[in-house]
Design a protein with these regions (language model features):
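N-terminal membrane topogenic signal
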Residues: 4-22, 172-173
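Juxtamembrane loop-transmembrane helix junctions in multi-pass integral membrane proteins
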Residues: 10, 14, 37-40, 126-130, ...
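Alpha-helical transmembrane segments in multi-pass membrane proteins
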Residues: 15-82, 86
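Aromatic-anchored segments of alpha-helical transmembrane domains
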Residues: 26-34, 83-91, 182-189, 223-229
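Transmembrane helix-loop junctions in multipass membrane proteins, especially transporters and channels
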Residues: 38, 61-65, 94, 98, ...
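Juxtamembrane helix-loop-helix connectors linking adjacent transmembrane helices
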Residues: 66-144, 161-172, 236
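Transmembrane helix-loop-helix hairpins at the membrane interface
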Residues: 125-239
C-alpha cells in the first residue's frame, strides 16, 4: 500500500495523477455527507466539488495522457450511444405502468428490496435553488463525466490489464479488466443496472475506437440529457 501511494507522488507518475486525482477528490466530497446536514447541504457540496474538480482537472490536464484522435465516425457513434444510455436509464421510471416502476425501483435501484423515498429526497433542493440546479447540470455533464471516463476507461481498465499501463496501446484491455471496471462503475451508481449498461457501452466505445474521446462524448451526452430530463419533468430522484 505504501509503495502504491508513493508512486502517485513520484515525478514520473504525472499521467496517473492526472487521470485519478480529480476522481479521488470527487469521491472524497462524499465523506461530508455522512455528517448531519439539511436537505440543501448535498447540493451545495456538489457545487463546490464541481468547481474544485474542474480546477484540478484543468491544472493536471489528463487529456495529455490519452489518445485524442478517435477513429472515423467515433464521435457520432459516441453521441448515439449517449442518447441510447439516457433512454435506457430514464425509460423504466418514465413508463405509465406503476407496477413496472415500483418493481424497478425496489429491485434495480440501491438498496435492493426497499423503495427509495424520493418525496423526501434532498434532491428537491434543486427545485428551490435554480443556480445550484444549473451548476448540477453543468457539473454532471461537463465535469464528472470526463473525470469518470479518465479514471475508469483512461486509467483503471488499462491498469488492471497491465500495471505498466502507459506502454499499453489504448484499447488493448483484458476481459478481466473490462468487466471489473464495469462492475465498479455500476456500483458507483444507485441505479446499478443502468450503471452496468453504461459502463459496458462506454468501455466498448473506448476499446473499439482506440480513443477516450468517444466515451467521454457519450457520457457527456447521457448526463446532459438526463439533467434536462430532471429539470423539465421535475424528476429530481435521478439526482
Amino acid at each position: 500500500m505504501k509503495q502504491t501511494l508513493a508512486t502517485l507522488f513520484a515525478k514520473d507518475a504525472a499521467p496517473t495523477r492526472a487521470l485519478t486525482w480529480p476522481f479521488f477528490l470527487w469521491i472524497a466530497g462524499l465523506v461530508l455527507l455522512f455528517f448531519p446536514h439539511d436537505f440543501d447541504f448535498p447540493a451545495i457540496v456538489y457545487a463546490a466539488k464541481t468547481v474544485l474538480c474542474a480546477i484540478l482537472m484543468v491544472a493536471l490536464k489528463p487529456w495529455r495522457y490519452v489518445p485524442n484522435a478517435p477513429a472515423k465516425g467515433a464521435i457520432g457513434l459516441g453521441i448515439w450511444v449517449g442518447i441510447a444510455i439516457y433512454v435506457l436509464w430514464a425509460l423504466p421510471e418514465a413508463l405509465p405502468y406503476p407496477a413496472v416502476k415500483e418493481w424497478y425501483q425496489r429491485w434495480l435501484v440501491m438498496m435492493p428490496g426497499t423503495l427509495p423515498d424520493y418525496s423526501a429526497s434532498w434532491c428537491y433542493a434543486y427545485s428551490r435553488h435554480p443556480v445550484l440546479a444549473v451548476i448540477k447540470l453543468i457539473g454532471s455533464a461537463f465535469v464528472i463525466a470526463p473525470i469518470e471516463e479518465c479514471f475508469f476507461r483512461g486509467f483503471l481498465m488499462r491498469w488492471l490489464t497491465q500495471k505498466t499501463w502507459q506502454t499499453l496501446p489504448f484499447g488493448e484491455v483484458s476481459r478481466y479488466a473490462f468487466w471489473v471496471t464495469v462492475a465498479v462503475f455500476a456500483f458507483e451508481h444507485d441505479r446499478y443496472v443502468g450503471g452496468a449498461l453504461a459502463g459496458m457501452a462506454y468501455g466498448a466505445l473506448a476499446v473499439r475506437t482506440g480513443s477516450l474521446r468517444a466515451s467521454i462524448v457519450a457520457h457527456v451526452v447521457t448526463n446532459f440529457l438526463l439533467g434536462l430530463h430532471v429539470l423539465l419533468l421535475d424528476a429530481y430522484g435521478f439526482w
